[in-house]
């Protein structure tokens, strides 16, 4: 978003000329121009910011004969405003004062305080806790092209997590969906490539185009080698030219926005092709993995399974859910860790209580390495590292059969007692929010600082005694010695009593109801106090820099410990989830099995428990080679969509290394997961609901292979009946004959069940129901066979359609079912009376007879307390009473 910068006229004031020069160097940013205690914005920046922030727009002077628009935000509260601007899509350049106004005056009375941009804040380069979600990664990603291949690189500036991946063009969209970057860097040339138009459209709100020259692979290679101090990157992985181009552009952009500074970046990890399950954006959305269809975290799969107690653990859990593994050995490694915490409940409980006392080391370390950290970040590092001995002892007890993953975490926690001891001695108990406020070094840590603080305290006592003497000498009891940043220490008296002051009182300022003075004695004492305070703060800042230097010198070890803390938190949280929700350990191998017994949908089950609506009805699913394609029929509201989703969700949970909501699971690795469930249009691209459905179905048919898992719900429903049936028919055949993948296909087209005679691996299954005296009971059970009815009219009745409409629908359905559809339609048009003619008078109410045993039994029942099974049993009991 580039904002036009006005030219610098010859008659511009020195301050405005400085502002325009800085703004010209950052045309794509809103410029926060520091003026004392405020950041001011001018011209179009002010107009845009005032609208986005809902703050007053004023004016200051003129430029080219026009008023200069202006708005501002206080420095002490700027982060809240900054967060709102970044969320609105703006980049913000922070223009700070680089010297004290007193220093500027030494160059001349008209000299302007030197200012420069110290940082450019973008959505992908945030580090402040107030601007970030503690439980989510904030990725900055870059895409580059070289030799016909694509490279994807991503970094979380707030944690230093850095990785690269070579990808095929057709998998770019899925890779970006996995990362969900806060900002995406793309070259001008790649941005204009027609092949990626739809991909960029999905991420248009976070795109940051860069000149193509920034993505030079050779320059990027040298840049990365220099960053890590190595002669070659081969030791980190066999990176392609495209990966290097993306990674180098990423690092350059971070350094550019941080004005020459870089956070501590981890050694670049290389994600191998096919290392994680590929899940496209539509599938993630349909399965509500990280957020619901309404965009909320609550109600998503992630929110349901997240039992972590640290921010880093929550971020790791989210990353594992977003990228399920495809290597059975790696999956077993994680499952062993989770299983350890399921088995050892006491260890799990104690470890989780200890982890709750561990602050976010990763983000504190990143801020410290950028020179943006403060005393509280040091305290966060200290407090987390202080818990390491207790954590290590918990998981390495001699009687425990500790798995390799837990042992590795215990080793990587490291030894930090000397650093913890120094930080505990150095930092004061109560730490200020900002280092510039001082008072963060503990008493007794540094003798020289203690002396300066003592002098300051002694001077403050002298100031109080001086105030008392002045009150006694003048007889003005309300006389006060005060201080502000403009005139420093001064004597303040009510205006009506100012004439009682003697000749030694020097006038400084007249207010509405008070007058301000000083004396030679006060000036001397104030100088001592100010000098002592300034020297104390300067020394504290030196000591702070030393402490930060010691921490950053051990950054690699501390980062390793932070990752181990996150790993323990994530594994123990999944163990907590498995234990409390009665989940079982899945068996994942290289076969094509998909045998799930007693499966439940974790989100729906949790919602039922919260509402006390009865237990979730578990179901089996076995997509063996002989029946790898299930055709699922049954009425609306019977649970088809939930059944489809729960099997996909269980596959994701199993491959992320979690226990699963089922009695048992044996499944072969799923390399790609596709879900076409639900209905939504895409008005921004001019796509109807049916068009979106067809686009997503096309992606499935073109990409699914033998190891894929596909779930499809009601394909073809958005068009004419015969068109929809024909499409669904052809899709089933293609899945069976060409894709040859494991698939669940839910449909209301009962005609598709005839395909079982021709397709050997097609198996029919249905959602079971019970009919009783014109009513329908949904059992939510899956059984073999095909449903012959959809009970849509029954659902319409439950939804509250007027009885006359329901009656009319039943009459129409009866005619259609008694004849072929074409002739039935003709009869409907010719023979049925119009809707209005169907209204019949209701019979008059009659007196009720004496209650029968049947009625007494009904009165004793509360339907809200019945499960589906209990309701069915009750129906049979009531029938016996007739």
UniProtKB/Swiss-Prot annotation:
Described purpose of this protein according to its UniProt entry: This protein is involved in the repair of mismatches in DNA. It is possible that it carries out the mismatch recognition step. This protein has a weak ATPase activity.
NCBIfam families according to UniProt: mutS1, PRK05399.1
Gene3D superfamilies: 1.10.1420.10, 6.10.140.430, DNA repair protein MutS, domain I, MutS, connector domain, P-loop containing nucleotide triphosphate hydrolases
InterPro entries assigned: DNA_mismatch_repair_MutS, DNA_mismatch_repair_MutS-lik_N, DNA_mismatch_repair_MutS/MSH, DNA_mismatch_repair_MutS_C, DNA_mismatch_repair_MutS_clamp, DNA_mismatch_repair_MutS_core, DNA_mismatch_repair_MutS_N, DNA_mismatch_repair_MutS_sf
UniProtKB keywords: ATP-binding, DNA damage, DNA repair, DNA-binding, Nucleotide-binding
Superkingdom in the source lineage: Bacteria
HAMAP family reported for this sequence: MutS (MF_00096)
Family: Belongs to the DNA mismatch repair MutS family.
Any GO molecular function: damaged DNA binding
Organism: Paramagnetospirillum magneticum (strain ATCC 700264 / AMB-1) (Magnetospirillum magneticum)
A Pfam family matched in the record: MutS_II
SMART domains: MUTSac, MUTSd
GO term, biological process aspect, one: mismatch repair
GO CC annotations, alphabetized: cytosol
CDD domains named in the record: ABC_MutS1
Listed name of the protein: DNA mismatch repair protein MutS
Binding site for ATP: 634-641
């Amino acid at each position: 978003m580039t904002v036009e910068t006005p030219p610098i006229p010859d008659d511009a004031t020195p301050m405005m000329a400085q502002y325009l020069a800085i703004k010209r160097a950052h045309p794509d940013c809103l410029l926060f121009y520091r003026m004392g205690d405020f950041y001011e914005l001018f011209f179009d920046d002010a107009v845009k910011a005032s609208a986005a922030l809902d703050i007053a727009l004023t004016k200051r002077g003129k430029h080219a004969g026009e008023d200069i628009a202006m708005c501002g935000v206080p420095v002490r509260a700027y982060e809240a405003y900054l967060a709102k601007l970044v969320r609105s899509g703006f980049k913000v350049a922070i223009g700070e004062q680089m010297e004290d106004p007193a220093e500027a005056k030494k160059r001349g009375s008209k000299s302007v305080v030197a200012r420069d941009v110290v940082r450019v804040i973008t959505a992908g380069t945030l580090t402040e806790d107030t601007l970030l979600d503690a439980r989510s990664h904030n990725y900055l990603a870059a895409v580059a092209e070289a030799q016909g291949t694509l490279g994807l690189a991503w970094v979380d500036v707030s944690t230093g997590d850095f990785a690269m991946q070579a990808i095929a063009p057709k998998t770019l969209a899925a890779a970006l969906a996995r990362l969900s970057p806060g900002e995406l860097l793309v070259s001008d040339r790649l941005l204009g490539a027609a092949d990626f138009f739809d991909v960029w459209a999905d991420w248009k709100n976070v795109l940051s185009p860069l000149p193509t020259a920034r993505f030079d692979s050779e320059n990027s290679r040298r840049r990365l080698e220099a960053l890590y101090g190595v002669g070659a990157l081969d030791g980190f992985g066999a990176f392609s030219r495209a990966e290097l181009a993306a990674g180098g552009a990423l690092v350059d952009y971070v350094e550019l926005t941080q004005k020459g500074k870089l956070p501590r970046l981890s050694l670049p990890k290389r994600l191998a092709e096919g290392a994680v399950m590929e899940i496209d954006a539509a599938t993630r959305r349909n399965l509500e993995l990280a957020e619901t269809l309404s965009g909320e975290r609550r109600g998503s799969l992630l929110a349901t399974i997240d039992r972590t107690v640290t921010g880093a653990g929550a971020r790791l859990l989210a990353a594992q859910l977003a990228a399920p593994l495809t290597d059975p050995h790696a999956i077993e490694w994680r499952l062993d860790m989770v299983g350890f915490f399921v088995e050892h409940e006491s260890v799990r409980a104690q470890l989780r209580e200890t982890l709750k006392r561990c602050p976010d080391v990763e983000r504190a370390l990143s801020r410290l390495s950028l020179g943006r950290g403060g005393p509280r970040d040091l305290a966060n590092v200290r407090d987390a590292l202080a818990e390491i001995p207790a954590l290590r002892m918990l998981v390495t007890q001699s009687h425990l059969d500790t798995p390799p993953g837990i042992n590795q975490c215990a080793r990587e926690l490291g030894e930090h007692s000397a650093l913890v001891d120094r930080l505990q001695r150095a930092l004061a108990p109560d730490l200020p929010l900002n280092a510039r406020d001082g008072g963060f070094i503990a008493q007794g840590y540094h003798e020289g600082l203690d002396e300066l603080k003592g002098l300051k305290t002694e001077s403050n006592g002298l100031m109080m005694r001086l105030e008392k003497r002045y009150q006694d000498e003048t007889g003005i009891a309300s006389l006060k010695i005060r201080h502000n940043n403009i005139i420093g220490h001064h004597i303040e008296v009510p205006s009506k009593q100012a004439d009682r002051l003697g000749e030694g009182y020097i006038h400084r300022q007249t207010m509405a109801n008070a007058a301000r003075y000083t004396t030679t004695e006060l000036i001397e004492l104030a100088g001592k106090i100010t000098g002592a305070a300034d020297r104390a703060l300067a020394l504290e800042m030196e000591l702070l820099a030393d402490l930060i230097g010691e921490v950053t010198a051990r950054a690699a070890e501390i980062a390793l410990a932070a990752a181990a803390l996150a790993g323990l938190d994530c594994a123990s949280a999944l163990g907590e989830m498995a234990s409390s929700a009665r989940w079982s350990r899945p068996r994942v191998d290289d076969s094509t099995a998909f045998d799930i017994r007693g499966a439940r949908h974790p989100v729906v089950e949790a919602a039922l428990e919260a509402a006390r609506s009865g237990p979730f009805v578990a179901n089996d699913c076995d997509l063996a080679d002989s029946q790898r394609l299930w055709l699922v029929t049954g009425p609306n509201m019977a649970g088809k969509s939930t059944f489809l989703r729960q099997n996909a969700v269980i596959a994701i949970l199993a491959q992320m290394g979690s226990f699963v909501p089922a009695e048992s699971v044996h499944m072969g690795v799923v390399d790609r997961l596709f879900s076409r469930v639900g209905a939504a249009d895409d008005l921004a691209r001019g796509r109807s609901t049916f068009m979106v459905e067809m686009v997503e179905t096309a992606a499935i048919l073109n990409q699914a292979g033998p190891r894929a898992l596909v779930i499809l719900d009601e394909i073809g429903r958005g068009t004419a009946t015969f068109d929809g049936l024909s499409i669904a028919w052809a899709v089933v055949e293609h899945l069976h004959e060409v894709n040859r993948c494991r698939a669940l296909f839910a449909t209301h087209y009962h005609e598709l069940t005839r395909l079982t005679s021709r397709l050997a691996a097609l198996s029919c299954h249905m959602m079971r129901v019970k009919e009783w005296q014109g009513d329908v009971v949904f059992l939510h059970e899956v059984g073999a066979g095909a449903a012959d009815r959809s009970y849509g009219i029954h659902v319409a009745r439950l939804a509250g359609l007027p009885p006359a409409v329901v009656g009319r629908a039943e009459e129409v359905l009866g005619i259609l079912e008694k004849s072929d559809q074409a002739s039935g339609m003709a009869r409907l048009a010719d023979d049925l009376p119009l809707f209005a003619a169907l209204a019949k008078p209701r019979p008059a109410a009659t007196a009720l007879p004496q209650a029968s045993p049947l009625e007494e039994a009904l009165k004793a029942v509360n339907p809200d307390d019945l499960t589906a099974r209990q309701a069915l049993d009750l129906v049979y009991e009531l029938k016996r009473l007739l």
